[in-house]
UniProtKB/Swiss-Prot annotation:
It comes from Danio rerio (Zebrafish). Keywords: DNA damage, DNA repair, Nucleus. It is found in: Nucleus. This is SOSS complex subunit C. GO terms for biological process: DNA damage response; DNA repair; response to ionizing radiation. Signal peptide: none annotated.
Length: 103
């Protein structure tokens, strides 16, 4: 096993001290900004209500796309199709009929 160089312990302590000082300065700056600008502590992200509304609108858009794809498939194909969520992003899936085996 190789021994650590003599100056490496000093370098590690120096790095830890620098990081601690930077962290302290960062906290001080954040605290002074929130005291000077009380509105700065307001989160910039939108509330969950907007996210739920966006998700609902997205689902309605997908449902409309599925309906259009299903109508197109029925009009231009002799096969059977259903709307179902697919792992591969397909809006509609073909349905294969089950045939009774011949005896």
């Amino acid at each position: 096993m190789a021994a650590n160089p003599p100056g490496q312990g000093f370098q590690n302590k120096n790095r830890v001290a620098i990081l601690a000082e930077l962290d302290k300065e960062k906290r001080r700056l954040i605290q002074s900004q929130t005291l000077n600008n009380p509105g700065a502590s307001i989160p910039l992200s939108r509330p969950a209500v907007n996210k739920e509304f966006r998700d609902q609108a997205e689902q309605q858009h997908i449902a409309a796309q599925q309906k259009a794809a299903l109508q197109h498939a029925h009009a231009h194909s002799s096969g059977f199709f259903i709307t179902q969520d697919s792992s591969f992003g397909n809006l509609i899936l073909p349905v294969l009929p089950r045939l009774d085996p011949l005896e």
